[in-house]
């Protein structure tokens, strides 16, 4: 990547599928390679033998030419096409930031999303809550230029998430302050800009105090620079609802908030129309759907414009077919387009029934849910979009259909993927109220923070519930303070967004009157409590907002006494239970049980998104595909067990043990098949046995350990439909494989490849013993993001270039740069030959 470029930041955001001539904004020439900068902020290098300057419609103006260290920079402004365009500009603002940690630190170049804590040394003083990673105070700055032609426009910066207590400065002047670390916010830059000159945007981030889990530190989500006409659709200013929905027709209603920051009123035309993903008018059965309204927007004010129309034969948003529509709002003044704002939405109905649970489009659905924190292993909380997409795709294939965002609003991109992949989502405002981390903010910020979440997220069809708190201290108070506080929040949400119910997630101890406040009750680890509550309150609607992954409570209102009966069994036994959300779906940093563990290790997926043996029960229970899996229980297995009742018995998907005494080992075999047969290492068959005859549909075969191969076969209707096998490996690995999830990436500076490394013996059997040190380096325009193994007790930093395998495997994460070419990933495994993996960046 070319360093020290004067970036010309205010450029239109157009789709890449338009022609090169339409998209082309500037050419930066560095020797022979030609650096192309696109409207959306992405760019790459092509090689040209001649300087090729394109004149768009004859409206090309050369602004300046500068020579520095053999670098010739030519920046173009297309008058009437981009520079003087009155339409909205939204440009990614992630690149070329400078960052320093603390007052005495030195600035270094970083790109967003950025989490400074994930790149620090572990410190026992930082504590288990944060995964022994410190916070501190960090400083960011970025230089950018706004052309003179943008005088009279409104220029703003949107931050999708900064953790936390962010103070925003422009050219040395404090212009904004945002406390909460999980909500997006917009800051107006217009009054403080220097047009035609360099501007410096600075951000001070104060993460001095601890939270209850790993939060990360810094500008850990995307940033966007926006330019609009003084009269424009307000940021997050559309509210799309579908008040009438059937298979034959649907009514689309949209309230659009239009702002006018000028000193005179403006008469405009507001048009809304359905468009496709590329902005072209969408016709259904040959009919174009659009509606127009003439309005006057008051000076220095806003106006809400409500418009609606009906469409025939709508495609409903569902888990199987998450169809999405696009509604474009066009503002015109004197016949000229001054703003375009597109909102993606879905047409669907939701209903919670006290007796039958949850319905989507009239179809009864059990929520097969997981609670998720937002960090992603070695990436920390600075999670590129591709990581979200990969994680959710894996969970979808596993059978998950619902996500609880615990305990904060997620990134906009996360919700976009939930919409497009097909998940039900509980969007959660915060954890505690006037206790814990949020206590310092509650009185001053709760209205703003709830509003920020709802106004930003209300058009996502995946969201079905607004959660206003988790395991609240107020729930146990015998006075009315807790009830009054809960009622205050509930009423605020209902007024702001009445189409979705409200929810509170309650710990096992709570006052009955507190549980009655919200539309839906979330029971944490309290399946039997819900069953008892049902007898007293048959009108109550509820779900299991947190459940253990293996055990369940043995007595009502007592989460610390438990049985082997999996909590999911209760969900299936009682129609009125809407679903369950396992804590947690994926291992995460923080909330560790003590040094050297760096986080939560009791989930069905590790931080690499590798499925643990314990996950087999849920795969069999949550998917229609035939499943039979083996998990061998052995208490000598060296693993981080996680916290007490969230643990499972230690299991491996392997048949390599040090025993020579024919020791009996339980082989757990969850299955959704009719019958299962086991074949031991001597070839002897056992069964068939029926999973339905066993607790949790899990057959337990008690087998004496003998080296060799164990096979299980699943049958449906008397025919084999699936099988699983485990083998004894040699003690020493002789080779390894590198398997990327994708070998071709976008050269956009953001895209990722996740490379799985697996050790094998001479017979091609995976080796999980005698782990080896792995060292990685990357050549080309890209970078190593980190190495993960799923081992929470790791000693090396998350950004280390070396890490031992764990149970014979690890994962390498690399990110593309912004120059087309080949990214070479060079891997050295201790005692084995070096390998080179090529990743193409296009």
Segments predicted by a language model, with ranges:
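Short flexible loop/turn segments that cap and initiate beta-strands
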Residues: 266-271, 282-285, 319-326, 664, ...
């Amino acid at each position: 990547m070319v360093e020290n470029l004067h970036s010309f930041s205010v450029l239109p955001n157009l789709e890449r599928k338009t022609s090169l001539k339409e998209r082309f904004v500037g050419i930066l020439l560095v020797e022979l390679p030609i650096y192309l900068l696109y409207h959306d902020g992405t760019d790459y290098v092509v090689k040209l033998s001649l300087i090729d300057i394109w004149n768009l419609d004859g409206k090309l103006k050369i602004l300046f030419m500068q020579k520095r260290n053999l670098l010739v920079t030519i920046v173009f402004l297309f008058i009437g096409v981009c520079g003087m365009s009155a339409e909205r500009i939204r440009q990614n603002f992630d690149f070329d930031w400078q960052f320093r940690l603390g007052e005495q630190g030195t600035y270094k170049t970083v790109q967003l999303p950025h989490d400074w804590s994930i790149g620090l040394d572990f410190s026992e003083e930082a504590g288990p809550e944060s995964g022994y990673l410190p916070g501190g105070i960090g400083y960011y700055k970025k230089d950018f230029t706004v052309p003179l032609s943008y005088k009279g426009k409104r220029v703003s910066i949107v931050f999708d998430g900064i953790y936390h207590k962010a103070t925003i400065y422009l050219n040395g002047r404090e212009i904004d302050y945002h406390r909460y670390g999980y909500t997006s916010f917009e800051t107006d830059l217009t009054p403080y800009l220097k047009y035609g000159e360099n501007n410096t945007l600075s951000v001070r981030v104060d993460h001095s105090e601890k939270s209850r889990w790993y939060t990360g530190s810094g500008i850990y989500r995307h940033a966007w620079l926006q330019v609009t006409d003084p009269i424009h659709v307000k940021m997050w200013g559309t509210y799309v609802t579908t008040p009438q929905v059937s298979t034959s027709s649907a009514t689309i209603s949209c309230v659009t908030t239009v702002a006018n920051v000028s000193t005179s009123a403006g008469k405009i035309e507001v048009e809304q129309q359905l468009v496709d993903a590329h902005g072209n008018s969408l016709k259904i059965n040959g009919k174009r759907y659009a509606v127009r309204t003439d309005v006057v927007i008051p000076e220095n004010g806003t106006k809400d414009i409500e418009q609606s129309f009906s469409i025939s034969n709508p495609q409903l948003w569902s888990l199987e077919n998450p169809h999405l529509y696009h509604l474009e709002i066009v503002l015109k003044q004197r016949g000229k387009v001054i703003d375009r704002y597109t909102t993606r939405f879905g047409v669907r109905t939701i209903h919670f029934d006290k007796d039958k649970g949850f319905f989507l489009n009239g179809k009864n659905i059990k929520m097969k849910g997981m609670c998720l924190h937002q960090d992603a292993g070695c990436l920390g909380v600075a999670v590129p979009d591709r990581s979200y997409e990969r994680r959710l795709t894996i969970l979808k294939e596993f059978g998950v259909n619902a996500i609880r965002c615990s305990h904060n609003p997620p990134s906009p991109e996360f919700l976009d993927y939930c919409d497009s992949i097909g998940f039900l989502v509980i969007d959660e405002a915060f954890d505690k109220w006037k206790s814990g981390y949020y206590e310092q903010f509650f009185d001053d910020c709760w209205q703003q923070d709830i509003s920020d979440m709802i106004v930003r997220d209300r058009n996502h069809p995946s969201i079905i519930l607004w959660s206003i708190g988790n395991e609240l201290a107020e729930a146990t108070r015998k006075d009315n303070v807790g009830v009054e506080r809960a009622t205050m929040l509930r009423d605020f949400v209902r007024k702001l967004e009445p189409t979705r119910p409200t929810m509170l997630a309650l710990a096992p101890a709570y006052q009955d009157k507190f549980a009655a406040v919200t539309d839906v009750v979330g029971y944490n680890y309290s399946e039997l409590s819900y069953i008892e509550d049902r007898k007293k309150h048959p009108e109550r609607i509820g779900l299991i907002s947190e459940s253990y992954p293996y055990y369940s409570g043995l007595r009502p209102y007592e989460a610390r006494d438990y049985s082997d009966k999996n909590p999911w069994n209760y969900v299936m036994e009682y129609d009125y239970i809407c679903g369950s959300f396992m804590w947690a779906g994926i291992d995460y940093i923080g909330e560790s049980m003590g040094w050297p563990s760096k986080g939560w290790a009791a989930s069905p997926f590790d931080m690499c998104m590798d499925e643990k043996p314990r996950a087999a029960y849920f795969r069999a229970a949550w998917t229609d595909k035939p499943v039979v899996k083996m998990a061998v229980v052995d208490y000598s297995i060296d693993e981080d067990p996680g916290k007490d009742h969230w643990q499972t018995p230690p299991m491996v998907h392997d048949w390599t043990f040090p025993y020579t005494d024919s020791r009996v080992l339980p082989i757990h075999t969850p299955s959704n098949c009719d019958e299962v047969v086991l074949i031991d290492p001597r070839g002897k068959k056992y069964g068939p046995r029926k999973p339905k005859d066993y607790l949790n549909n899990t057959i337990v075969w008690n087998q004496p350990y003998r080296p060799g191969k164990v096979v299980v076969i699943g049958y449906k209707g008397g025919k084999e439909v699936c099988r699983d096998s485990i083998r004894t490996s040699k003690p020493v690995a002789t080779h390894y494989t590198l398997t990327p999830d994708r070998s071709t990436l976008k050269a956009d500076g953001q895209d990722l490849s996740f490379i799985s490394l697996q050790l094998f013996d001479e017979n091609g059997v995976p080796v999980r013993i005698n782990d080896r040190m792995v060292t990685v380096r990357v050549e080309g325009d890209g970078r190593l993001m980190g190495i993960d193994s799923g081992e929470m007790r790791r000693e090396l930093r998350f950004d280390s270039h070396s890490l031992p395998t764990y149970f014979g495997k690890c994962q390498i994460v690399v990110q593309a740069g912004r120059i087309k070419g080949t990214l070479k990933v060079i891997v050295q495994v201790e005692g084995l030959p070096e390998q080179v993996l090529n990743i193409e960046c296009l």
